[in-house]
Amino acid sequence: MMDFDERVPVGSNMYLPGCTYYVSGTDFSSLPPFLPQTPSSCPMTYSYSTSSLPQVQSVREVSFRDYAIDTSSKWHSRGNLPHCYATEDMVHRECLSNPGTLGDMLSKNNSVLYHSNSSHTSNVYGSVGRNGVLPQAFDQFFETAYGNVENQPTEHPVDRATSKAPPPAESGSDSCRGTDETERCEETSSPEPSSGNNEDKFSGSSNGQKTRKKRCPYTKYQIRELEREFFFSVYINKEKRLQLSRMLNLTDRQVKIWFQNRRMKEKKLNRDRLQYYTTNPLL
């Protein structure tokens, strides 16, 4: 195949790759040359008269600005219907007859469509709108989109404050209900203490307010004696338990619960020790 620059007219000898001979140009004398350089070298006949058609400029001569911003002389359909437009629109159309740039046309079109009153200034870019970036022609969009939101906080501040006041009271009542329910659950779930510990069930019963039962930790002396007894016997009998309760000033139930918790703790320690020694073969 030949390159684009090496193409020659059909009038000269042309070599066809599929053939073994040259084709002379006399066989194609009725055809015009290949890719004519001028429009006049390739005349064409039309079934209609071309004199009635308007003269169209070349594509290279028409720029984007001339195409986008067209004067009123190019659009004949608008001039034929003057009765469909109001007088005010006609005045603005005259103002838009020769705009300078595409941005001026767009800004002025917006001013015609949305701000056609007499108080609107001709210099759109000189006056900046509410948003600080776009011209005043775009203020209507911000008024419709954000106007209601901006006006809402300043309408009824007192009503909003009064409407927000009741929820804390309800939350406080809910928290009180929650504390009452937890206290009831604790009372039902925990077994009743012995007769010697009934007086410290509620410390604030005289005030009429229910308070949580205070934890009474064991003293160092009590813990030392209990640990000593646990060292000799993990399971304590009833006689020894009563003896410890009288000696340490504790209830029988407190001593029993301490031994139960201590056995669970010892079991956990033994499990941890076994796991530690089995995972380390060097020990």
Curated annotation (Swiss-Prot):
* DNA-binding region range list: 211-270
Q: Where is this chain compositionally biased, Basic and acidic residues type?
A: 177-187
Q: Where in the cell is it found?
A: Nucleus
List, as start-end ranges, the regions of compositional bias called Polar residues. 188-209
Keyword S-adenosyl-L-methionine in annotation: no
Pfam families registered for this protein in UniProt: DUF3528 (PF12045), Homeodomain (PF00046)
GO BP annotation list: embryonic skeletal joint morphogenesis; regulation of transcription by RNA polymerase II
Which GO cellular component terms are attached?
Answer: nucleoplasm; nucleus
Region: Disordered, residue numbers = 150-215
Q: What is its main location?
A: nucleus
Molecular-function GO terms, alphabetical: DNA-binding transcription factor activity, RNA polymerase II-specific; RNA polymerase II cis-regulatory region sequence-specific DNA binding
Q: Keywords on this record?
A: Developmental protein, DNA-binding, Homeobox, Nucleus, Transcription, Transcription regulation
InterPro entries reported for this sequence: DUF3528, HD, HD_metazoa, Homeobox_CS, Homeodomain-like_sf
Q: Which family does it belong to?
A: Belongs to the Abd-B homeobox family.
Q: What does this protein do?
A: Sequence-specific transcription factor which is part of a developmental regulatory system that provides cells with specific positional identities on the anterior-posterior axis.
Q: What is this protein called?
A: Homeobox protein Hox-A11b
Q: Which organism is it from?
A: Danio rerio (Zebrafish)
